[in-house]
Amino acid sequence: MKTPKTVPEVKLSWEISADEITAILAGSHSNPFAVLGVHQAGDAFVARCFIPGAEEVTAMTLDGGVIGELKQLHADGVFAGPVSLTKLQPVRYRARRGDAEWAVTDPYSFGPVLGPMDDYFAREGSHLRLFDKMGAHLIKHDGAQGIHFAVWAPNAQRVSVVGDFNNWDGRRHVMRFRSDSGIWEIFAPDVPIGVAYKFEIRGQDGVLLPLKADPFARRSELRPKTASVTAAELEQEWEDEAHLKHWRETDKRRQPISIYEVHAASWQRRQDGTMLSWDELASSLIPYCADMGFTHIEFLPITEYPYDPSWGYQTTGLYAPTARFGEPEGFARFVNGCHKVGIGVILDWVPAHFPTDEHGLGWFDGTALYEHEDPRKGFHPDWSTAIYNFGRTEVVSYLVNNALYWAEKFHLDGLRVDAVASMLYLDYSRKHGEWIPNEYGGNENLEAVRFLQDLNIRIYGKNSNVMTIAEESTSWPKVSQPVHEGGLGFGFKWNMGFMHDTLSYMSRDPIYRGHHHNELTFGLLYAYSENFVLPLSHDEVVHGKGSLIAKMPGDDWQKFANLRAYYAYMWGYPGKKLLFMGQEFAQWSEWSEEKALDWNLLQYRMHEGMRRLVRDLNFTYRSKPALHARDCEGEGFEWLVADDHQNSVFAWLRKAPGQKPVAVITNFTPIYRENYSIRLPSAGRWREILNTDADIYGGSGKGNGGRVQAVDAGGNITCSITLPPLATIMLEPEN
């Protein structure tokens, strides 16, 4: 043991008043930094501490030098005394009780970590690296290593961080309040990575709230536990520069994008029914998607959520990948593995609302902090959730920073923003009298509009490789147009009209389809009003809707033929593609989050044929610029047959500058049609590059023998083709 230094006589009182001792022991002292820790007393220094269970306390420097013996002021663990120091500095204590001895580094002897500029930018809402400042971060500070905790709770009387490291005692680590920003912070020395913690908050009324998880937590406990967990900074060795460079430098509207939508918890399961880890998913999902030709994987929300049947859409931890699949590093490895084989990763992201679980954001500091206080703006009647207050700069900053966090830290390629329509309209799912008009008397949520515009400006400004996709179900204009042109600034928008109209048409018996011909032609009137993604998503195979194959009419053969024809129709239609897992092999049953997909179906010819078709559609779509380069521009489309409602035949030409055109022809009746005359743009031989009725896909094998001949009859170029029943074919000129 090092020799104790001489302790100078302290002329000023180093003791603590009885009232302050009472407040410290009761956990009601709002600023223990003013009392505990090291303080100057005249020309000398004193140390005061609160160490429950201690009978004796010796003060030391961080390197172990003894600087004084402290006097017990209260039997519950309050000590104080003069210490031999020449300046304010952090100290450590050696505490004893009987034969037990332990060391405690004093959190109140450390200065603040955040600075005035952090306060300024946080309050202004322009801090774009809040995720490096807020939450829990392992740092070295004033010579010690530990966790810096920071949380926004401007209306709280007192905030403490509690966890495994202090026996969940809210009196031990009461945080320092930064009045300029409303942020509370504390550096907790010696706290390691991997420990659970929450915030204990005393509200405005002096009442303790339920313990709160960290809004900026980067890791959480596995449900049903709800605590946040201290996490190290990601140390992923990224090997994806070529992938990122490609998407930074290309016009995404002119690239092939075919998205495989995945619920990570139910794509596959282990034999015992438990969920796969990220590494297990990487070993199976990535090669599967690469083989299938999908360009992107879009995950249903993977941010931490407490309730499995919510599928992740009611998140309580926007910054933490859910613990269901392992640690955050596992997800980073998954993304890196995708990028190495050229597959992008899109996150389904939920900034519209949050659940009211008591450990979450609701009434976070005893007031409506993240949500509107008025339920007409702050409560969502459809989901019984709270709505973010988009008019509060700190809340907008929290959400924008979260989007930037996923793009920067995890190299995500896109964010699909959920429930945009519910954000845009003040009267969404509300009756008369249940909503508040905007300042102009309208139903537009102008604060949400500004948030979405700011979100897209920030994302594209800092991460041009990332794309944002809006799930917006109304006719709100210019969703995917630039902000400077009055748009919301999204890269793409889901085409809900396409999904609704085409599935409505396909569910009809073919004998009646002729009466509903316009359900398919109508969509081309607005197909280029936005940059569209055509979504056959999870929403279409849940809540009693059945699977896609189950929606098709007819006997089993006709159901499969209908779905094959529909898929090829969609892959030939202008717009990017999205297909929910299991639908690529025509799973019969409705999707359930509780179990894996019915992979056993692939042993059957018709299901394996469907999978092969989707695979071939993806590679055809990707390899033929005519099918993707003008997905979002009208010049890439030309009707060939638009009004043959009697035969339910549709045909069009897909085009791209300097590339061979592709003719897409669909027969939506079970009638085998020979010698069907169709106009084509050039004479000569046209090759059949895809036929959904091919035997390898489970079809009847009817077609055109691989090619057709277009003849120029006085300037009118036509060809006579065979249209298989319930089938789509694609043709391209040989020369």
Swiss-Prot record:
Positions of the catalytic residues: D418, E471
Metabolic or biological pathway: Glycan biosynthesis; glycogen biosynthesis
Record SMART domains: Aamy (SM00642)
Top EC class, one word: transferase
Any Gene Ontology biological process: glycogen biosynthetic process
UniProt catalytic activity: Transfers a segment of a (1->4)-alpha-D-glucan chain to a primary hydroxy group in a similar glucan chain
InterPro entries in the cross-refs: A-amylase/branching_C (IPR006048), Branching_enzy (IPR037439), GlgB (IPR006407), GlgB_N (IPR054169), GlgB_N_E_set_prok (IPR044143), Glyco_hydro_13_cat_dom (IPR006047), Glyco_hydro_13_N (IPR004193), Glyco_hydro_b (IPR013780)
GO molecular function, one term: cation binding
Keyword flag DNA-binding: no
One CC-aspect GO term: cytosol
Enzyme Commission number, as recorded: 2.4.1.18
Record key words, sorted: Carbohydrate metabolism, Glycogen biosynthesis, Glycogen metabolism, Glycosyltransferase, Transferase
Family named by the database record: Belongs to the glycosyl hydrolase 13 family. GlgB subfamily.
Job of this protein: Catalyzes the formation of the alpha-1,6-glucosidic linkages in glycogen by scission of a 1,4-alpha-linked oligosaccharide from growing alpha-1,4-glucan chains and the subsequent attachment of the oligosaccharide to the alpha-1,6 position.
Subunit structure: Monomer.
NCBIfam families found in the cross-reference section: branching_enzym (TIGR01515), PRK05402.1 (NF003811), PRK12313.1 (NF008967)
PANTHER family for this protein: 1,4-ALPHA-GLUCAN-BRANCHING ENZYME (PTHR43651:SF3)
Protein's recorded name: 1,4-alpha-glucan branching enzyme GlgB 1
Species classification: Bacteria, Pseudomonadati, Pseudomonadota, Alphaproteobacteria, Hyphomicrobiales
